[in-house]
């Protein structure tokens, strides 16, 4: 389909915002939302007329809107859910009936709303907090602007699923997000109870267009109902109408976006709930819009200095003890153990000449001559209380290209937020200068292991986590907001050998988006795995842009987001000072950008290992052949080829493959026990050679794209023990499966 030809009158929409702002409002009334829609290219906003409180409309005015019935809606700056308080009435289109209902609403709605607030005081608008009884009802009554008379347009169907919600929302992390799905008063229930992506879908407006979003929307129950694809249902809207609607909302979102430096206003929220459908017309039945003034864009960080952070030629440290094993001393020893030249390391330590063979100087002003007054990387391992003054000194002396802030106590708690804000303000100020100053990793950062940079600043002793030192690493990076998460992945799965392991900590300066963009352009990395707890303002959007760029460049991006539940969000806030956003939005945006999103820690770990080891393999398709010596596992393989996130097919064998497998089974005397199937259960009696030859036959089949082999480690016929005195069970035996 070609892009919709839309005529959006941005000047008229901006004037609506100007008028509301001049009246001290940050929202549009419902009738103003209908005006906005009419200026956005929408075909059928209903006719509406505001009956101001205290006015005396004539019969002619009340009858000016056509139809058999009239819809009356209360208009108030504080009442959002009008139906619950009797704020919506449908009456016969007769002047007296309209007057009666209108007058009744002006008295009944304040009473109903006051009663509702007294039942749910925590949900009360700020204007009504602490009020009750007649005082509360009077305050609500004073805020009523009047009643809106709206054209009644009966829907084609009132069946479940025949109403559509379309909304824009400005999110802190991902900017403007468009969502659409099952509309009506039970929208929240649908989103909560239906499977992911069935009730509501969402996308970043900067990373999609009308047609792309429509492709996503087609997967929902809402589309199947609207398009007449369910039993007893007929189509009530065209695909072209939906695409045009989505495209209009996307363009408005990107115009009134915090990412647009020329935006006159920012749309905080624009929602139509619901659109109903009458004779192939999309009719908005309710709408709301909130807006704000534009804000100053964040100062860009000198992210090119990440290269100095990851590949430093010189390193400085502060916080190294000469007499005991503290974090700083452990970091020093790990740096040297990874192979970094000690003559290119300097310690800030007054009263000492050398610690572990590394030179000490009394202050940052005394850096060795060959360092020219500045190091590529400066590691801060002192207490959080010392950090603000130290950051000032580093910046004033231009003493480092990059800084690693190890200490916590920099924003994780209320008590430490003032200290963190002080440091952030100082860093942002230097970033605004021509030089830009250093970049800062952390705070609350476990450090970095950079195999190409030949250094390790993790504060974990070698005795606790022995590492395979040297150049045996893969073209992968693990970026984690939690150092402990990264530590446990490497401890549980030592087969993981990424070139870089980076603990981001609190993102005081450098962000997840910055780091992903760096590795997107890195020639040393093909696989990027990210554990996130929360994004800085707008950084989720930057992250997704970098994900898309990386994937289009042929790289794999793996992602796990913590803080999926209210309890999880609370836990992450206390961990690394992250602000957990809405998981559904995060999941949608990151997936649509092209990342592989893991559901569990174990799945993340497994996917990372697969991506590390198989990235350079060519996978032609999703036709799978599987073999196992355990029957339950073969069944489990068949049960696991589909999920909400992926779909594979069990391959059909070519005749030559069937013949080869049958001949092998006869040779191994398994033909009476094993049949040719996919997945193939070859019985615990199958030895290592049988497993290997079955897999080889499957791999040669032109109908097979990948082979999955399950090994039964307890089978007496298999070599599966790493340490044993019995050669028949030894993993490294030449006849075993491992050497094959």
Residues covered by each model-derived region:
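Catalytic-core regions of core metabolic enzymes
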Residues: 1-740
